[in-house]
Amino acid sequence: MTLDYIYHSGFAIEMEGVTVIIDYYKDSSETEHNRGIVHDYLLQRPGKLYVLATHFHPDHFNREILTWKEQRPDIQYIFSKDILKSHRAKAEDAFYIKKGETYEDETIRIDAFGSTDVGSSFLLHLQDWSIFHAGDLNNWHWSEESTEEEIRKANVDFLAEVKYLKEKAPNIDLVLFPVDRRMGKDYMKGAKQFIEQIKTTIFVPMHFSEDYEGGNALRSFAKNAGCRFISITHRGESFEITK
């Protein structure tokens, strides 16, 4: 399998005969609009093409993806239902799922799980791989700014969603999860709790924009917990991954 880091929380998964693009925000070029690994390569890649969006926030859902069907009329879009409810897309634009619902065809299964923000997180089952994209699921709190009650509630809400996921998927091959230093000193707490609760084979940080150092700071914790950790160094970076 090839994992492509596009930007922020945007990734692509390449397997034989299939490409999956998740939470596209911007393409990988830092200088040219609509240039990079998506426009220059992935949209031309042979095989099935799935485009997923976990929620309507603009750093996870760029309406430009709907224009890709002009080039690739075979695209299958799978979006979280909040995108429809917030009128970011029309009913006919995609297949919509929310927590507890599934999209499945002969190639892929996508189970929607919860979020501690809006929308969903997605668990993909593809060619013997289980792949979890957290969307905006995280223990979102800002220790220097949040009240004790806000911190407590964030912790309770997050652990409840992780528990629900663990009941269905106690082991996951590949996890893409927010590690965002803008949250302050406890910014890695949610990622650490996730790894402690769910047996994760490979962990990949996301949602850090250009802060590669902050995203990769979880590496030692993940390795000590028995995870393989993928350190990202630039937009458009590709990784050949085996179990």
Predicted regions mapped to residue ranges:
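Active-site environment of divalent metal-dependent phosphoester hydrolases
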Residues: 28-29, 56-61, 83-87, 101-103, ...
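Active-site HxH/HxHxD metal-binding segment of metal-dependent hydrolases
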Residues: 38-103
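Metallo-beta-lactamase
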Residues: 74-129, 230-243
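Active-site-proximal loop/helix segments of hydrolase catalytic cores
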Residues: 116-196
